Swiss-Prot record:
PROSITE patterns: RIBOSOMAL_L17
Single annotated GO MF: structural constituent of ribosome
Keywords for this protein: Ribonucleoprotein, Ribosomal protein
Signal peptide residues on this chain, from the entry's feature table: none
Protein name: Large ribosomal subunit protein bL17
Subunit structure: Part of the 50S ribosomal subunit. Contacts protein L32.
Intrachain disulfide bonds: none
Gene name, Swiss-Prot/TrEMBL: rplQ
InterPro entries from the UniProt entry: Ribosomal_bL17, Ribosomal_bL17_CS, Ribosomal_bL17_sf
Amino acid sequence: MRHRKSGRQLNRNSSHRQAMFRNMACSIVRHEIIKTTVAKAKELRRVVEPLITLAKVDSVANRRLAFARTRDAEVVGKLFTELGPRFQERPGGYTRILKCGLRTGDKAPMAYIELVGRPEAAEAVEVEAAE
């Protein structure tokens, strides 16, 4: 029985799943938007949002926790210098999932997962409005 088991298996063993979400979390922190399947995007929220919450308080202990979860010093630096201060007043909900159709090969539902309030999105809207 699977009582009280949370999270999706995604047809992977636990170490593969953990490595995949660690890599995806690093990618979304670096690029602030990535394209993936809807199921992976929904699970990725559970990894990324606590990292950003951790980054709101810049301390050595929090940086070490973030590094233990991402294993990437560049990502930890961006979390604590850019993303933590950006989301300081927001009490959660740092990501947005936008569905974008089906994948060509296998018709898997795809989605963009992005960080809310990313600067590129605001600039793109202003450019389109000006045209």
